[in-house]
Design a protein with these regions (language model features):
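Short, strongly hydrophobic alpha-helical membrane anchors
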Residues: 1-10, 136-138
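Cytosolic-side transmembrane-helix boundaries in multi-pass membrane proteins
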Residues: 7, 86, 117, 178-185, ...
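Single transmembrane alpha-helix segments in multi-pass membrane proteins
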Residues: 7-59, 82, 86-98, 234-242
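Helix-loop-helix "hairpin" substructures at the membrane interface of multi-pass membrane proteins
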Residues: 18, 141-218, 242-248
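Hydrophobic core segments of alpha-helical transmembrane domains in multi-pass membrane transport
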Residues: 51-55, 73-79, 106-114, 152-161, ...
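Transmembrane helix-bundle core of multi-pass membrane transporters
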Residues: 61, 90-91, 95-166, 193, ...
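Transmembrane alpha-helical segments in multi-pass inner-membrane proteins
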Residues: 62-74, 195-275, 280
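Alpha-helical transmembrane segments within multi-pass membrane transporters and channels
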Residues: 62-107, 113, 247-252, 282-283
Length: 291
């Protein structure tokens, strides 16, 4: 019984760490899809880019880990502004099929570029000494870096919630998600809002990709291998919501860890079955708005 409880705590802890990473990466996709109505399947490319920025900055240039996290966010956010202005903005009025084909094409290009520059091997993550080893908590030892992931991501969740719920920018985002035409009629510059929100969501994906590089391997196939997880978080949580993807990411992180620990022969199949069941029950997601 004691061994089972220990494994239960371990699964919950590691699942929570994975869930927090999935949330930091996916929440931007949820908000931008709810705000812009753009089917951006290339969101994982931004997470992969953040992972490469972090690992390259640390291993090749000796950048301290905290600064490397900042660089991952800033570089990806800046690159996303260029892509949004040059490419994405031209397809806002396009059909869903055209948007899907465009973003899948971006994935193929990003994968080819990553493979050309870095090869096919997983990028190693060099952690600072203070994030190595174990952290004692409630009489148990947990990996210090996983504890850091949970705490740091929790702070990011709080800051994001404050930004969306308690600032003028957040009020404009919520108004535009609810009714874009009405938001434009009262003077909200939706084009500029789209760019800023897209940059924030992409930057968070880059930050999550770098932060979670020790959990979700950074390699050229990253956008394809993890696309389903990001879409499941968004679809189960609901578009345009902060709370929904948070709950969905934690559930999926814990469920994925539990399946790999207790039912490795089934892989992620139980998660897909549960996702289908939830969407049949609530097509708009757990916290999404019904049409």
């Amino acid at each position: 019984m004691e061994a089972f409880l220990a494994s239960l705590v371990s699964v919950a802890f590691h699942g929570a760490a994975l869930g927090m990473i999935l949330y930091v990466i996916s929440v931007g996709l949820s908000v931008t899809m709810g705000l812009m109505g753009f089917a951006n399947l290339a969101h994982g490319v931004f997470a992969m880019a953040g992972g490469y920025v972090l690992t390259t900055a640390i291993s090749r240039f000796g950048v301290p880990f905290p600064l490397a996290l900042v660089l991952a966010f800033a570089f990806v956010a800046a690159a996303s502004v260029v892509l949004e202005r040059l490419l994405y903005s031209r397809l806002y009025a396009a059909s869903d099929l055209e948007q899907v084909l465009f973003t899948i094409g971006l994935i193929f290009i990003a994968v080819a570029v990553a493979r050309f520059i870095y090869g096919t091997l997983q990028q190693p993550v060099v952690l600072p000494d203070y994030l190595k080893g174990q952290f004692a908590l409630l009489g148990r030892d947990f990996p210090a870096y996983r504890v850091f992931i949970i705490v740091f991501s929790g702070v990011m969740v709080g800051l994001l919630w404050f930004g969306v719920e308690r600032t003028r920018w957040g009020a404009m985002v919520r108004a535009t998600v609810d009714n874009r035409a009405m938001a434009q009629s009262v003077g909200i510059d939706t084009k500029r809002l789209f760019t800023l929100t897209f940059a924030l969501g992409s930057g968070l994906a880059g930050l999550g990709g770098g932060l979670g590089a020790e959990i979700i391997a950074i390699q050229p196939s990253y956008p394809f291998e993890n696309l389903v997880y990001f879409l499941v978080v968004v679809s189960v949580g609901g578009l345009g919501s902060l709370r929904g993807p948070f709950v969905a990411a934690l559930l999926i992180g814990i469920a994925d860890t539990a399946c790999k620990y207790w039912l490795p022969q089934y892989g992620a199949f139980p998660i897909y079955v549960a996702t289908i069941a939830i969407l049949l029950w609530r097509p708009a997601g757990l916290f999404g708005r019904r049409a």
